[in-house]
Amino acid sequence: MSFPRGSQTQKIKHPIGTRKGPLEVPPPTEKDWPKDDEQDHVLVDPDEELDSLPQPYRMINKLVNLLFDQSWEIIEERNALREAESSQIQPTVYPPLGEIQLNKMPNCMAVSQDYVFIGGAKGFSIYNLYSAKQIYAWEKLKVDVTSIWATDLGNEILIAPVDEMGIIRLFYFYKEGLYLVKAINEVDDTSKQTTCIKMEISQGGDFAAFLLQGAGDIWLDVYKLPKETWLKKLEHPQLTSNPKKKVRQPQLNSLGPISADPLEMDANVSFKGDIKLSLPVYIMKIKPPKPVTGTTFKSPLEVFAKIKDCYGLGSGQNHFIKDSQWEQQAEIFNASYKKYLDREWEEEPLSTATFYFLLPSCLFAMPPEVKGPSGMACVLGIHWTRSHNFFLYSLNRTLKDKADPEGVWPCAAPIAVSQLSCSSSYLVLACEDGVLTLWDLAKGFPLGVAALPQGCFCQSIHFLKYFSVHKGQNMYPEGQVKSQMKCVVLCTDASLHLVEASGTQGPTISVLVERPVKHLDKTICAVAPVPALPGMVLIFSKNGSVCLMDVAKREIICAFAPPGAFPLEVPWKPVFAVSPDHPCFLLRGDYSHETASTDDAGIQYSVFYFNFEACPLLENISKNCTIPQRDLDNMAFPQALPLEKRCERFLQKSYRKLEKNPEKEEEHWARLQRYSLSLQRENFKK
């Protein structure tokens, strides 16, 4: 085959480092080689020689080079990370102050007053928070406690453990006695057994609500707790006890203490199985809202008659939209989004609920004929999965009354997450579109609406006790703070945000921790505020680290870690409890399998006790964390000070600014001297 002369010339490839001019055979020794200038050489792309390799070697060569380049980038990235970490100041890591040793794996824990409640394989145990001694153990064969709640009622504590069968029991812990109130959802027929998913007890312990699931249905049972009757019966047992009644001896499967841990027991605490307390009063059952269907009303007048007294207004149930209109809208929707609807969709899980007990306020006023003690809940607020509405149910009802909502707060998007503050004064509703609605329930108006950054969606909300920054230190104001709130929001992308709102000013959102892009092991898994330390939160990361962050300064103060033999085996789901009254928290340490023995019965599990006051960096913060309100008022409203104080403060601030610039300081003092001389001359003339 012949080619044109021109095309044959174009296909000539120069070797690397070829010379201009005629080719010469170099001498056999380097001494005789001519010393040419760099201009006499033609630099050719080295890749041209690689491209000349035949297949499949050319592709293999490119893949090897690509793999080498990627490996080199990873090596450089790791080296840069090591250099950055070595240059940064690592936070001080504090070990635990105490340890609770267990023979069983602790599944859950709760802290209330001076007690720790730990749920395990055969029930739950009660420990002293400071001495780490077991004071009582309630255990039942073949029952694993998977979750536990403890509510402080002042002198009493309500304990609610849930076992692996989903049965929730309500216990009353008073002085030296533990009393079983009721097994809320226990039935004789196991085929009809329901499962408790969630529970909530009102502030003060007057009401309790239990979210139950069974037979493909889900609902909320609400009870009124006769705590005054319980207290009266236990304080005056001689008035209610029957001396002729025989006490039944506990059997093998009855409720009773079966100690399994070789720890010191407190003989004063015991289970009072012979004393029967009054049962909770069942007041209502709440089911998820029905799907919106075509109207059954024949005229708009029937609709208005249905919603008299404004009950249920805004829920979308009582409307005048016909089935044909719904079908027409469904056809339009299916035609517009057909390519998305043709996919295989997973079956939607059962709807669940989030609910709170709300105190009387401007929004929830109790009827005049109803007289209740101050601080007693009057309304139950609830929202269901994929629902736009936040429903309000009055607690002033009986079982005969129909469980219709007294109020509805509709939102623009389905409510994904919500949270009520510990004081029940503030409520945050986070929708699926990333919009937060902040409510001041005590005053009865919204604090504002804030939107998370684009791509961020709320995962959990954690309220902080309101604090102020005074002289560079976080302080709690003395007295009650009104219409001011702060909370941290953990998003689904593991970013952490601080949300602040004050009065009529719009809420602000600031980023505390950015979304991890390269180092996924630093992903935040859980966040817990520390009430004993103003503006502090515990951050649990995927790599097992536990850090304490100051949200005002946006920096890590210190870190906490269990001993090396007890790492966090499941760091993305840590088991911990923060005390609401004391400067401490508890963390479960998972036993290391590397050091485990062949005998599983000899394995010891531990719950570690960390005290913030034992840390040198934190010991002064928890002891001096309050500031008088007058100091904050002086800082916030300097115009309220006398004229002399205001002038003195102004001169002090000006002097601090001048210290940074010596030239301006000399000029300023010279001007003051001239002014003072002129004032003296005027006085002499007078």
Swiss-Prot record:
Residues 1-40 are annotated as: Disordered. WD repeats lie at residues 410-449. InterPro entries: NADH_UbQ_FeS_4_mit-like, WD40/YVTN_repeat-like_dom_sf, WD40_repeat_dom_sf, WDR93_beta_propeller. Residues 29-40 have a biased composition (Basic and acidic residues). It comes from Homo sapiens. This is WD repeat-containing protein 93. Residues 1-10 have a biased composition (Polar residues). GO terms for biological process: electron transport chain. The gene is WDR93. It comes from the Eukaryota. PANTHER family: NADH-UBIQUINONE OXIDOREDUCTASE (PTHR12219), WD REPEAT-CONTAINING PROTEIN 93 (PTHR12219:SF17). PROSITE patterns: WD_REPEATS_1. It holds the Pfam family WDR93. One of its GO terms (cellular component) is respiratory chain complex I. Keywords: WD repeat.
